[in-house]
């Protein structure tokens, strides 16, 4: 569920998001690599027509920082990753894709390479 990050990782470790974030951010998926002490926030964006997702893509840096407030309490880092379908290969996304990388976030098309999450 979208609440798994909280139910299975943060709450059992005594982290109450309300003390650090004004919003309970709900990632599509979260993978925690205990060996590298990194939380991977994974957002899936699969479009087949124009929509409101376009503006949301540039929020990755802000959201990564929001998650980092929680993970850093446990000495964990955070990586923010988008998984896109081919819709986002259109030229009109060139600038936002460049921005995503420029601010230290990542994106992949269709699937995430295991090496990206430390496996």
Which sequence ranges carry the predicted segments?
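Active-site metal-binding core of divalent-cation-utilizing nuclease and nuclease-like domains
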Residues: 1-35
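Conserved catalytic cores of phosphodiester-cleaving nucleases, focusing on short active-site segments
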Residues: 29-33, 38-47
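Amphipathic alpha-helical interaction segments
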Residues: 33-36, 68-74
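Short beta-strand-loop-alpha-helix junction that forms the active-site gateway
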Residues: 43-57, 83-87
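Short, charged, amphipathic alpha-helix that recurs within catalytic cores of restriction-modification
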Residues: 53-72
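Domain-level recognition of nuclease-like catalytic cores that cleave nucleotide substrates
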Residues: 72-119
